[in-house]
Amino acid sequence: MTKTLTNKLAEKEHAAVVTYIMGGDGGLDNLEEQLLFLEKSGVSAIEIGIPFSDPVADGPIIQLAGLRALKEQVSLEAILNKLAMSKVQIPLIIMSYINPIFHLGIPKFVELVQKTPVKGLIIPDLPYEHQKLITPELQGTDIALIPLVSLTSPKERLEEIAKQAEGFIYAVTVNGTTGVRSEFDAHIDSHLAYLKSISPVPVLAGFGVSSIEHVEKFAHVCDGVIIGSKVVQMLHEEKTAELGAFLQKAAEVRIKN
């Protein structure tokens, strides 16, 4: 069964734009408003980060957002309960470290997720080899377990991951944490083009994407982008008009590969 998320991101004319927000940054009561605003801005899907005290993959902007959410006593369960009432029509993606999921309990987590518009799951600290901790519970659901692949992964590993991939492949564009960047690795284009050539699902570039130029660059070699730190910062600074205009422009970028 092809997952809903794959179908949504596989549109070939325009680059898929997925935005990341930290769930509960600014309080849980703002979550639905943020989601509806991003949907109206033309994004393809929205990643919702779950605040965690030891976020190893997060850069400073997202770490601070997580701390703000933790101060509001935001939890994974509270976010899922809020999402169960969401009116959002585009797919949502939960991005959580494994610890909050274990704490809630994997069966309960999957049960709660299925009551929401969430169609994808990213667990940055769950290695590919240990996916079986959660895949049995996801079987038969419309929830895609999305793999992250790094710049340094050997080709055999990329091929193995691509073969099993669901939803989309999250291609990490830098060696390091998330955050706004001006430059990318010299080999990033060939890496993404190779991934796209072997992947049965869309390939999206993430970590450091923060300008229209970045979106246009990656539209030459993959299917779209994930924009995180820039979105988190602009929402925090309440620059919604500026952010909305940026995202609408990003969503109009045409795929050129």
Swiss-Prot record:
GO terms for molecular function: tryptophan synthase activity. One of its GO terms (cellular component) is cytosol. It comes from the Bacteria. Its EC number is 4.2.1.20. Keywords: Amino-acid biosynthesis, Aromatic amino acid biosynthesis, Lyase, Tryptophan biosynthesis. The keyword Cell wall biogenesis/degradation does not apply. GO terms for biological process: L-tryptophan biosynthetic process. It catalyses: (1S,2R)-1-C-(indol-3-yl)glycerol 3-phosphate + L-serine = D-glyceraldehyde 3-phosphate + L-tryptophan + H2O. It is an enzyme of class 4 (lyase). Signal peptide: none annotated. The active site is at E47, D58. The alpha subunit is responsible for the aldol cleavage of indoleglycerol phosphate to indole and glyceraldehyde 3-phosphate. Tetramer of two alpha and two beta chains. This is Tryptophan synthase alpha chain. The gene is trpA.
